[in-house]
Structures are given as structure tokens and as C-alpha cells.
From Swiss-Prot:
EC number of this enzyme: 3.4.22.-
Record keywords: Cytoplasm, Hydrolase, Meiosis, Nucleus, Phosphoprotein, Protease, Thiol protease
Predominant subcellular localization, coarse grouping: cytoplasm
Ranges annotated as biased composition (Polar residues): 335-368, 379-390, 405-415
Location of the region described as Disordered in the Swiss-Prot/TrEMBL record: 1-42, 320-415
Name of encoding gene: nep2
Role according to the record: Protease that catalyzes two essential functions in the NEDD8 pathway: processing of full-length NEDD8 to its mature form and deconjugation of NEDD8 from targeted proteins such as the pcu1, pcu2 and pcu4 cullins and other proteins. Has a role in meiosis.
Designated name of the protein: NEDD8-specific protease 2
Single GO term (MF): deNEDDylase activity
GO biological process, one term: proteolysis
Length: 415
């Protein structure tokens, strides 16, 4: 949950430096001002413990394994403490979300055509914090990434911290903004979470983009503990990003997550396996200093459990739209899942296939207008998930007191 390492980042901007103090590396402790108490540092024997050493206790000097960099993945550096927070029972830090977002950027967005990848921007937690807390957002405009201003959809991980220089923040939630529609979809795995911080972020974003936004609270799977909210943000980001990448080819994109499943245990395990696989394949720096890119075949194997690279490569591109005589196909609203051994080990996937648009399908094939939805796509045979997987398991059904205050939201249609 916590955002313990936001201020360890170096941001070359006078506006940012004036608005905050740089923060020392996190000690891994959690000391909330709210009702949550620190999650126990669980020790787990096995491969991961032998790889990363002992549990985070004792002295943490400057040269200790807890502060030195264990893995550099492009623009994100993970220390021992950051890696520990992927283990069960730990709050997710902003660095953990950075790592997940970097994977989505490198393994998903940048492998799509440029005209598609530029439509989606994953804003990092540190930038979201500065945006939400800035008294005058125009003063930090130069510190924000230029690509954000050209995107159609912006993903903002929201943290409820409003303090600089100390460990703070106790909850993560997700805000997805459609710039064209002037609309934000808010996903909170605790229905009584940080609405105020969501409003601050979208208000300042509207000032920067010179646009008024309205926010819709979406039905979202509820977490069953106090430490998985950051994983919900990561998984919800992946699901929604995959759906939005299908936007040129399907008549409607469903932004609801009420039927989705977030398997936090499996996601934590998958991310730890990614880290160990990267270390084994590339060493502590990815890519290596002598290289500018990574090996696609290695990456396909390393990231297959998180982003299903092979499924992405089968998605059509704008140039793949064939003649008007092509038959329409609906793309899967989420990635196909391999047959799980048990529900606890199944990758959290959601949503059945989108329904075809009868108005488009009923039009004659001889129409001179090319419609992106009329394409020939080879879909995977496993694209339709079993009904048992699509149904929400009892373990994530919200408690009565949280379910009573959830806002009912209809599907959002995006053209």
C-alpha cells in the first residue's frame, strides 16, 4: 500500500525540487497515521529467500544489500527492499508500480504501432503525486512528461499521501482519464478510499489540459486484506490497457471491472519470477550497458505470465485492416488464460468477448468506407474463458458494509 520511495527519485526540474524534499531510501518499515497497522515481514524459505538473502531486519548501512541496486530494468531500479515488497504480506511501494508500468510500456505499448501506443500513457506514481499536490499545476508543467499531453487515455495510480519527506500514504487506487470525453473512471479496491486525492489529481490535470473532467466511480473487485491495493492497481491497469488497445477494432470498449478477478497471490509470484528470470538472463542491468535493447525471444518467455506477449503479437494493427469484404471478428476483451491447476494459481483475467455491433454488421460489404471493426483476425482457441473462471470467487466478494456503498455503474461506450 505505502508509497515509501517516491522521494528517492531524482527529477531534474526546479519546479519539482522547490515543491518537495528529497527523501532518504526507505527502511522498509511502515508507520501509518491511519488505522492500518504495519504488515508483518513474513519470512519464506525456498528459492527466493536463497536468492535475495535474509529477511529485511537489522542494520541497513549505505553499503548493505538493502540499499544497493539489485536490478535495473530500463528506467526503473529495484533495491532489496523493493523486491521484498513483492512478497506476500507486504505493502506495494511506488517503485513496485513503476516496475510493473515499465514492463507494460516495454513489453506491450512499445510493441504496438506508434499511432496506437501514443494513445495510452502510464503516468508514474511520483508524477501523479506532484500533480495532485501542486498548488499551481502550471508551475510543474515542464516537469511532466511531454508524451502525456498527446495521449488520449492517461492512467494515474493514486496514493492518499499528502506529506513530503516522511513515510506516508496507506492506500492505492486507479484513475483512468479519457481526454477526448472529458471523463475519468475511478477504480478503488476499498470503496471508502481516497476520493479526495482522485479529485485533486483530475482537477489539476484539467487545468493543465484546459479541459473540465467528470469522474465516474466504477464497480471494482474489493481486496480482502490491507496490503493488496497496489496489486489491484497493477492488474486493473493491465486489463483496461488491453481493452483500450482493441479500441480501433471493436465498436465498444467496456470499462467496467465488476466481473474481473484479481489473484494477488499469483501476481506476486509472477513478478518475483520475472525478477529472477531477468537476473538469470541479463544480469543486474537490463539491457546490458553494451546493448540498446533486449532479446525478444528471452522476453517472450520471461514476461509470458504477466503480459502474454504472444497474444499481443497476434493482435491486428491499423495496417492489417483488409478489404471491405472481410468478415467481422470480435477481439477478446482480455487475454486468454492457460488451463489453471487451481484457482489460486490462475492468472487474473476478465470479461468475455465483446458483442459485435449489429448496425455495422448489417451494412453491405460493398460500402466504400473502411471500417476498422471489419477485419480478419486469427483468434486464439482459448480466447473464451471457462465460466468458472469468469465468475468472481467467494474470496473476493465484498463484505456487506463495503458492498452497500459501492456505486452502480453501467458500461461506458467509447467511440
Amino acid at each position: 500500500m505505502r508509497s515509501n520511495s517516491i522521494f528517492t527519485k531524482e527529477i531534474d526540474s526546479e519546479a519539482v525540487k522547490k515543491s518537495s524534499n528529497l527523501r532518504p531510501p526507505s527502511t522498509g518499515s511502515s508507520n501509518s497515521n491511519g488505522s492500518d497497522t504495519a504488515s508483518p515481514k513474513k519470512k519464506k524459505k525456498g528459492f527466493f529467500r536463497s536468492l535475495f538473502g535474509s529477511s529485511s531486519s537489522g542494520s541497513k548501512s549505505c553499503g548493505s544489500p538493502f540499499t544497493r541496486i539489485w536490478l535495473e530494468y530500463f528506467e526503473v531500479s529495484l533495491r532489496k527492499n523493493d523486491v521484498d515488497h513483492f512478497r506476500p504480506g507486504y505493502w506495494i511501494l511506488d517503485t513496485n508500480i513503476d516496475f510493473f508500468y515499465e514492463i507494460m510500456l516495454r513489453q506491450v505499448l512499445l510493441k504496438r504501432p506508434k499511432e496506437e501506443s501514443q494513445q495510452i500513457y502510464l503516468l508514474r506514481p511520483a508524477m501523479v503525486f506532484f500533480l495532485a499536490q501542486a498548488p499551481n499545476p502550471l508551475e510543474i508543467e515542464s516537469a511532466l512528461p511531454p508524451a502525456m499531453f498527446d495521449a488520449s487515455f492517461i492512467f494515474l495510480p493514486i496514493n492518499d499521501t499528502n506529506e513530503c519527506g516522511i513515510e506516508s500514504g496507506s492506500h492505492w487506487s486507479l484513475l483512468v482519464v479519457s481526454v477526448e470525453k472529458g471523463l475519468g473512471w475511478y477504480y478503488d479496491s476499498m470503496s471508502n478510499g481516497n476520493t479526495n486525492d482522485c479529485n485533486l489529481a483530475i482537477k489539476n490535470l484539467g487545468i493543465l489540459l484546459k479541459k473540465e473532467f467528470r469522474v465516474r466511480h466504477m464497480k471494482t473487485p474489493q481486496q480482502i486484506n490491507d496490503c493488496d491495493c497496489g496489486l489491484h492497481v497493477c492488474e486493473n491497469t493491465r486489463i483496461l490497457m488491453y481493452r483500450l488497445l482493441q479500441k480501433p477494432y471493436v465498436p465498444k470498449v467496456d470499462m467496467n471491472l465488476d466481473h474481473s478477478v484479481v489473484d494477488s497471490v499469483r501476481l506476486r509470484k509472477a513478478l518475483m519470477e520475472v525478477i529472477t528470470s531477468l537476473l538469470a538472463a541479463y544480469g543486474s542491468k537490463v539491457p546490458k550497458p553494451s546493448e540498446t535493447h533486449t532479446d525478444p525471444e528471452k522476453d517472450k518467455k520471461i514476461f509470458s505470465k504477466i503480459c502474454k506477449t504472444e497474444e499481443l503479437l497476434e493482435l491486428p494493427t491499423l495496417s492489417a485492416v483488409t478489404s471491405d469484404s472481410a468478415q467481422p471478428h470480435s477481439l477478446p476483451a482480455s487475454m486468454p488464460s492457460s488451463q489453471p491447476q487451481s484457482r489460486s494459481e490462475s492468472l487474473p483475467l476478465t470479461h468475455p468477448n465483446s458483442e459485435p455491433n449489429p448496425k455495422l454488421d448489417s451494412q453491405p460489404n460493398s460500402s466504400p468506407v473502411r471500417r476498422p471493426s471489419l477485419i480478419k483476425v486469427k483468434t486464439a482457441s482459448t480466447s473464451v474463458l471457462p465460466t468458472s473462471i469468469l465468475q468472481r470467487p467467494p474470496s473476493i466478494v465484498p463484505r456487506p458494509e463495503t458492498a452497500a456503498i459501492q456505486h452502480t455503474q453501467q458500461s461506458i461506450e467509447i467511440h
